UniProtKB/Swiss-Prot annotation:
Homotetramer; arranged as a dimer of dimers. Pfam families: Ldh_1_C, Ldh_1_N. Its EC number is 1.1.1.37. The keyword Oxidoreductase applies. It catalyses: (S)-malate + NAD(+) = oxaloacetate + NADH + H(+). NAD(+) binds at residues 7-12, 32, 94, 117-119. This is Malate dehydrogenase.
Length: 310
């Protein structure tokens, strides 16, 4: 199994290291446009092999030729939003980056599974799908896995219980448009509504929506990377080991939930072939309305990018 991570920043490098440490790849490529960064980080990771007991071949590179014949490619490359930059500016710049990255990936790998982490995530996943020409089941956005992890951690914090006993369902867009589905959120099989008052649940939902911004506020510079990287690796593990995990991911819908030709976060089965099944679960009307609203925002932004992404 050969896995490539595009972007050697905090998210990309942490993702690459966790993949190596969990022995999920025979060969791992960390690629970045900045010379020296992927080479140095890649070598540093490789030198942990004797301690971590893994033999993964790790290559840091600035040359897409080194990514040839990758089975999985993870795109983390992109710019953060800067002061004075409009959302439209960010969309255009990152769409251009993801377009170029995807074009270069496809020059060297015929049929990879592409996992997109770059923001705005659902829209960038659409860009990668359009440019790659791959079937929708092979282009996946990391969305709800991270959001559900945050929701679960906040619930555990509130109740003082193990995170392992908490299951949460978060659908929709990654960010303000996410839809934490309370009725499918449980603690050891017990509905969360039986354990916490509605106003507390509402506060936890809102904190989940602002989870990324909360970390940015603490850090002052930079954004979250441990939890995003761990979420990507959970997806990679399910694909590589054919685990058939049911995880919330941004995928291209074709009529499910009344949404068509739009990438949005829903529960899917992830296995060796990528997205092997999309689950259309029963939602309350309020949650369905929020999910469709989230998809509409993604669709509008994608239409704005049509001339950019070809």
């Amino acid at each position: 199994m050969k896995i490539t991570v595009i972007g050697a920043g905090n998210v990309g490098a942490t993702t690459a290291f966790r993949i190596a440490d969990k022995k999920l790849a025979r060969e791992l490529v960390l690629l970045d446009v900045v010379e020296g960064i992927p080479q140095g980080k890649g070598l540093d990771m490789y030198e942990t092999g004797p301690v971590g007991l893994f033999d993964t071949k790790i290559t840091g590179s600035n040359d897409y030729a080194d990514t040839a014949d990758s089975d999985i490619v993870i795109i983390t490359a992109g710019l953060p939003r800067k002061p004075g930059m409009t959302r439209e500016d960010l969309l255009m710049k990152n769409a251009g980056i993801v377009k170029e990255v995807t074009d270069n990936i496809m020059k060297h790998s015929k049929n990879p599974i592409i996992i997109v982490v770059s923001n705005p995530l659902d829209i960038m996943t659409h860009v990668a799908w359009v440019r790659s020409g791959l079937p929708k089941e092979r282009v996946i956005g990391m969305a709800g896995v991270l959001d559900a992890a945050r929701f679960r951690s906040f619930i555990a914090m509130e109740l003082g219980v193990s995170m392992q006993d908490i299951n949460a369902c978060v659908l929709g867009g990654h960010g303000d448009a996410m839809v934490p589905v309370v009725k499918y959120t449980t603690v050891a099989g017990i509905p969360i509504s039986d354990l916490l008052p509605a106003e507390t649940i509402d506060k936890l939902v809102e904190r989940t929506r602002n989870g990324g911004a909360e970390i940015v506020e603490h850090l002052k510079q930079g954004s979250a990377f441990y939890a995003p990287a761990s979420s990507v690796v959970e997806m990679v593990e399910s694909i590589v080991l054919d685990r058939k995990r049911v995880l919330p991911c941004a995928v291209g819908l074709e009529g499910q939930y009344g949404i068509d030709k739009t990438f949005v976060g829903v529960p899917v089965k992830l296995g060796r072939n990528g997205v092997e099944q999309i689950y259309e679960i029963n939602l309350d009307q309020a949650d369905l309305d929020l999910l469709q609203k989230s998809a509409k925002i993604v669709d509008e932004n994608c239409k704005m990018l049509e001339s950019t992404i070809g």
